[in-house]
């Protein structure tokens, strides 16, 4: 799976969690909190939905991602 494929899948997750988001503006550098309005509860929901979407688990104790690209990288790392 490529980083772009993960981004495309993550956009599907974001579309459900944040339906008002213009997905054409979401890229690897998009900031989760400042640009998407992801708060702590939304971050948990994003993590759970991403794990379900990609059939993987994020490791415990990892620093919380701050950008969409960091989420993509964490997914790829977990799938490796």
Regions found by a protein language model. Give the residues of each.
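Phosphopantetheine-attachment site and its flanking helix in carrier
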Residues: 34-52
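Phosphopantetheine-dependent thiolation modules in NRPS/PKS and related acyl-activating systems
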Residues: 1-34, 52-80
């Amino acid at each position: 799976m490529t980083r772009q494929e993960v981004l495309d899948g993550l956009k599907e997750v974001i579309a459900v969690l944040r339906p008002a988001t213009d997905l054409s503006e979401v890229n690897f550098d998009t900031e989760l909190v400042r640009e998407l309005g992801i708060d702590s509860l939304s971050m948990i929901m994003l993590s759970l939905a991403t794990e379900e979407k990609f059939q993987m688990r994020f490791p415990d104790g990892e620093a919380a991602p701050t950008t969409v690209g960091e989420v993509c990288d964490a997914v790829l790392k977990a799938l490796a």
